[in-house]
Amino acid sequence: MSYKQVIIIGAGLAGSEAAWQVASSGVPVKLVEMRPIKSTPAHHTSEFGELVCSNSFGALSPDRAAGLLQKELRIFNSLIVQTADKFAVPAGGALAVDRSKFSIALTEALSNHPLIEIKRFEQLDLPSKENITILATGPLTADELSYKIQAFTGIDACHFFDAASPIIYGDTIDQEIVFKASRYDKGDPAYFNCPMGKNDYINFRNELIKGEQVNLKDFEKESANFFEACLPIEEIARRGVDTMRYGPLKSIGLWNPKWGDLFDRENRLKKRPHAVVQLRKEDLEGKLLNMVGFQTNLKWSEQKRIFRLIPGLEKAEFVRFGVMHRNTFLESPKLLLPTLQFLKRENLFAAGQITGTEGYAAAAAGGLLAGINASLLAKGKKTVSFPDQSMIGSLMNFISNKNQILSNQQKNKFQPMPASFGLVPELIKRIKDKRLRYKAYQERSTEALNDFKNQLDSCFDKDHLLSKIY
């Protein structure tokens, strides 16, 4: 039986993975890549899946979030991860690759597939509604297509810069120091508050100002409004000794009952902190906490060093560090189903960094799911979502409308997220030991995915499904 061609825009990691999954299921693909006709400021070749930042896919061990994600992708014979395994270079406990050999091999694998048609041109608009399409254009989507995506999704649902605060694990804060409260006791105590004395504050500000920053790329410097909408915390600190105290670190209206009677003026003046750093829940359970107002351009090592000076965060572990860079991404929880289909157009999918995932393996995971579902749709079958217990499923839930249902994310600005154990559902039986807990997450994921894959296999011609590459 012949099927209508699926169009995939973008041959980065997500687009390449999606193309392979669709073609391997017996459905023809048109893979559109604008390079080398038109390049981006960050790319240097015309190869598919060019790694423009690090050459690392993160930790290999499945007791790490990135490692579990890689393991899950191997279960489904991911083109990206299999190619990365083949061209791995020594990197301790991480999966790192020879960039050139990796991208050349990807390009050859896709170019030689009989069901994949490669087209090199700049896509200026979304394909017609009759076409099953996967949008995988990445964080440097060309301007013309960006405008069309913005028109399709709505002006408030497409972002062009990523100014994100760090996120830390909730169980790594010092509960003896940090207290829960909302300003002026309005509503439930929604924030975790880190009080700072005057000396703490001055020392923190001095280190913040001295902290080493990431060098912006030329195309980021050229954007006049890059820092205007969302000032880095270190820039706020530079504007005056007390500027942070009257901005994101203001202490007014926050009180810890341990300090005594709030209405005793003398006690209040004596005990009120000089400044307060607030942490906001990213999920209902409080496993992930966002540092409110701490968007930053500091290097990651400096963020870890300086932010651990905050009382209560001395042993904080970071899920993700703050970033400020050019990054086209969607307000995905308002737009996407967990299947990566757009709510308003079921035959249009999005995958990769444009959906708000971070990391190479996460991009591949989005491509894998979008590719599987585009194949199912082409065959007139029902699309699927990955099990909640898996890292892939949890990550796709976070960037989809399921997030709106499961968390308070609809109240907060959506921020891109890497793979994290903070996203997966809690175990039925709580395990305190972190190493054993992560092992249990891994075992639960593997069991759920094996069952899921068996069910998925029945939807496809097994001679085609998710075929091996080498």
Curated annotation (Swiss-Prot):
Judging by the UniProt lineage, the source's domain of life is: Bacteria
Iron-sulfur recorded as keyword:
no
Q: Name one GO molecular function term.
A: flavin adenine dinucleotide binding
Q: Which UniProt keywords apply?
A: Cytoplasm, FAD, Flavoprotein, Methyltransferase, NAD, NADP, Transferase, tRNA processing
Indicate where this protein resides in the cell.
Cytoplasm
One Gene Ontology BP term is: tRNA wobble uridine modification
Give the matching InterPro entries: FAD/NAD-bd_sf, MnmG-rel, MnmG-rel_CS, MnmG_N, TrmFO
Q: What Gene3D superfamilies does the record point to? A: FAD/NAD(P)-binding domain (3.50.50.60)
Predominant cellular place of this UniProt entry's protein? cytoplasm
List cellular component terms (GO): cytosol
Cofactor or coenzyme needed: FAD
Say if the entry is tagged with keyword Cytoplasm.
Answer: yes
**What is the role of the protein in this entry?**
Catalyzes the folate-dependent formation of 5-methyl-uridine at position 54 (M-5-U54) in all tRNAs.
The similarity annotation says: Belongs to the MnmG family. TrmFO subfamily.
Q: What is this protein called?
A: Methylenetetrahydrofolate--tRNA-(uracil-5-)-methyltransferase TrmFO
Q: Which gene encodes it?
A: trmFO
